[in-house]
Amino acid sequence: MGLAFKPGTDDLREAPSIDNISLLLKNGADIVAYDPVAMNNFKKKFPEGVVERGTISYTNQIEEALKDANICFIFTEWKEIKKVEPEAIKQLMRTPLVYDGRNIFDPEKMKAAGVEYYSIGR
């Protein structure tokens, strides 16, 4: 979740989402991407549909991005993502596993909710 290099912009320069999503698609991942601002720019790099060995689709709803997901990567610290309750993540995801590259959630709250949570760089 989160495609821009920082919140408040649609700028993708140096965005960690680009390399990471590219690698996931090359390895056959099916991705549902969410970003409140940068999705149109991201679609220019990764058009919706089959890409490499995987697929990518886009949604304007965080809940839809999480629904039945096996893993969630957080690349941008959007306030919309920060508002998601750990319990909702647990309920929506098939496998509640989150890699948070922006440290937006409290690890103890995620653990208490039953979410396997990895906060990168903390």
Task: Give the ranges of each region predicted by the language model.
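Structural/interface elements that position substrates and couple domains in central-metabolism enzymes
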Residues: M1-R122
